[in-house]
Each structure stands twice: as C-alpha cells, then as structure tokens.
Amino acid sequence: MNTTRARRSPSRIRSLAAAAALGLLLSACSVSDPEAPAADGEGGDATFSIAVGIDPDTFDPAGQTTTTVSNMVDYVVETLVEIDDEGEIAGVLAESYEVSEDGLTLTFELREGVTFQDGTPFDAEAVVYNLERITDPELTVPQGAAFAAFESATAVDENTVEVSLSQPSPGFVSALSATVAGIISPTSVDAEGNSYQEYTRPVGTGPYEFGEYTAGESLTVTKYDDYWGEEPYYETVVFRVVPEAATRESLLLAGQVDMIILPPVSDIEALQANEDVEVLLAESDRTIFIALDNTDPVMQDPRVRQALNYAVDKQAIIDNVLFGAAEVLDAPMAPSLFGYCETGSYEYDPEQARQLLEEAGAVGASIELLTPSGRYVQDAQAAEAIAGYLREAGLDVSVSTSDFPSFLARVNAPVTENTPEAHLLGWAPAYLDADFQMQMFRQATHPPAGLGTSFYTNPEVEALLAQADVETDRDTREQLYCDASQIIWDDAPWIFLWTQSFPIVYDADITGVSATPVEKFDAMYARPAN
C-alpha cells in the first residue's frame, strides 16, 4: 500500500526511537443530495464524492478522536512529519529534524515558502503556537498524552523550532504525525466562527480549504490555489454522511458517490466480482472491544470482567456477523504495533463464565451496552450478538444505539455523569507503536482528559508504562509493553474482541486510492483512470 503522498517526495528520517537507542544525533535530509461526482471533469474542475458512516464531532485537530474525521481534517491541515509506508518518519512541513544526544532537545527545520489558507505565513512562531496549544491543560486534547514530555518550544529563527522535553520520549516525533498535531493558522483561532476553545473552521496549509459543513449531511472542501505542493486533480471534495452501510453501497453503485468506506461486509464478494468498482481490503491497527466501566460496583470485580470475556464467542460473531472481516484479539493491541506480543486467549466457555458470575454474585446484574451505528464494521449488529451471549450467561443486558457524536459525548464524560456499564468502541493508534495504544489503560487518560473510557488503572501497569516512556533500548522497551499487556489481559478491563479489516470500495474509473496502516484512506490525489 502506498502511503507517501506524491507531492512531498519526502526524504527518510530515521526514527527517534532508534536514534535515542544509539545515542546519536539525527537529522533528516532534505443523505441530502450534494453535487453528484463528475469523474471525467475537464482540467481538474470535477467533484470527488466520498460517503462515510459518521457525522464529525469536531474539526479541531486538537480534539480528534476518530480516524474518519481525522481523514477529513487531513485535507485541510498538515503535520510536521508523517509515517511512510515502511514505517519511517518523513518530513512534511518540517524538512528535517535533529535530536540531541541526551534526547531532551529536538530541532526542526521548517519548509520555506508555505502559507496558510488565510494568507498568513507558516513559520516557527506558528509551530510554537500549535505545540503550546495541544499541550495546554486548559484545552481538552483527548490524544494529548502522547505529548506529556513536552516542556517548551522556541522559535530560534523564522524557519527553526527548538523543542525541549522533560524526559526522553521515543514516541514524541512519531506522535507529531497524528492529526491531533496538525498545524493551524494562529490568526484563524480568532476569526469569525472560531475561538481558542471552540475551533470549528480549520485553516491549515493543506491542498484543500474548509468549505461548507451541514451537520448530518456533508462537508465540502475546495482546492487551495496557493498550495505549496502537488496540485490535486479535483477542484472539490464532498464527504457525505451516510450512516447505513447498505445506503452507501447503493449510492456508489448508482454513481452518486465515487468512493465509500465500510460497505456491508456481506456484500464484499459480490463487490469484488463487480467490474464497475474496485475493492481494497486494507489491514488495520484498530482493536474493537467492549470497554467495561471498572468503577461500576459490578464491574469492579475482575471475575465479572473475565466472565464476560469467556461468555462471548468472538469467532462465531466474526464468521456470522462480520463475514470473516476480522481476527480475534490475543493481546490488548493489534499485531501490527511495535510492542505487541501474543498475550493470551479467552476461549468461548459459557460454563466458566457462569461460574465466575456466580462466585462474584453478579448473576442477574443489569448492564447497558452502548454502541454506535455505522462507525465500525457491523458495529450495532455485533453489539446485539454480544448482548445475546451475555444474557445467556445470566446478565440482564439492554442495548442502546446512538449516532457517533452523541455516543462520544457519553463515553467521554466524567465517570460521575451517567456513563454506561459497557460500550463498544474501536481504537486505531495514529502511529504503529504500543505507546499510543497504552493510552487506553492509563489513569491520566480517564475521561474527560483522554480516551481511557474503561476508567481502568493498575499501579503495576502504570510503573511499566512509565519505564517504557523513557526507555531508549528497543528490546527492553518492547518487553516492558509485553509485561504490561499480560497484566492488562488478566485484569480484563475490556471484553477483548477483534482487529477489523478496513474495506474501501471505489469507482473502477478512478485511480490513486490507497490506505495507510493506521486505518485512513488516502484519496487526496485520486483522479480519473483515463
């Protein structure tokens, strides 16, 4: 899969983790009815239309929680670096960076001649502003834990930024590739419709400008004429919000959209046989799980949480509900992440589940299982199947289905505010490192500060992860994550379900569509095949 966008032709930058391990100094070389797609438009004045399953909850890079929304924001906002298809750090708005021998100072050399879409210059002061904003404790940054080592940033000159860290942080530069670290125009924060806390119309340096957004219907972005890099083909890109997978598929087959993500998995084989469309079954780093409220009086007992894991036949759900589009988890993270090791197995064992529930005195307990609809592969259908297994084990389970923004509002609320006992969630790290995945199991990321929505904490895990935060030896760091994974697996803060595949389907007359290893589609430079 090609994940390096052609406009950048980035030079490779060795990973910070490797640099710190060697103690070297590194530097890098240089469904309403919006306009229907017009794939054969002359001069690139056509519209490319993409159907997605969820309505965005925020367009502020700092507030990102969801890869689909981040995909939209990426059309407008760029980052200092990106992760290429070989897992290497590549420059985007930063042409190079250096790491001091002690790992505490990072120096970035910025790309010159870049302007924001409001006409203001991209420079070192803008980078300092953005780094200070995403580390501001007064701003809610759900993925901000990755930048915990940030101490300060200084504009050395117009095109040089020096970042000081409080401790070595092997994952810090990789984290700067995530949309949460997207660089926005400081001037735009005070523009009409925006504020520091409520940033709704992003202004970045990307190839497209934010256009019109109608909640529940669509987002339109338009080509930025003064973009510094390669010009995209399409003048306009429309993201249509279509929660029902079958409706997305129908729109594609009727020629009303050019591309969809997450089609009905039951139709994958038929779509693959259809000469009018192309099917991309991309690998994903996303784990799907049932987050259990570990502060709930019933869920506090680890026997209950383990019982719920034994109660669910994950493989049967994958076979019969997901039509094979997933793999059962054997660790608290996907196998594609650095730090993964095979940890264990909760084989389907209804008798063991019932016994543990009886020992814990939890038979008959009432549980609300909250699920989004249209966000993940067969999410609502899977939740119903899981609820059936839990009822068979002796629990009183009700399923609540919600649109995604409302769902996020509930699961990201403080523990005192009517959180559900269980909710179906997916987590796809923005870079392939356990550092990002383990945010889900740290007390510092309990909502609303972060996305640790199970409110799980374990002092042993905290200690191991604190060591991993600063460990520069790759093998030692990997073992620390493996040790933490084993404890988490036994504690069972989640019902560990599966890693899903990421199906993308698009018009066969289109070329230039691919996927990244972190469950994002890459269609920025899509164009007619002929």
Q: What are the language-model segments listed below?
A:
Residues I50-V52, G119, Y389-A444, E478-L480:
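Periplasmic binding protein-like
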Residues S177-E231, T236:
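Gly/Pro-rich hinge or "lid" segments in bacterial periplasmic/extracellular proteins
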Residues E95-T140, V156, E162, V298:
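Aromatic- and charge-enriched surface segment that lines or borders ligand/interaction sites
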Residues D396-S406, Q439-D507, N530:
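Extracytoplasmic/peripheral linker and loop segments enriched in polar/acidic and small residues
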Residues A51-E101, E132, V203-G204:
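N-terminal lobe/hinge region of extracytoplasmic solute-binding protein
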Residues Y224-A270:
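Ligand-site clamp/hinge motif
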Residues E109, A145-S188, E212:
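Surface-exposed binding/hinge segments that line
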Residues Q300-G388, E392-A393, T457, D483:
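Append "and occasionally in soluble cytosolic enzymes with long acidic Gly/Pro-rich linkers
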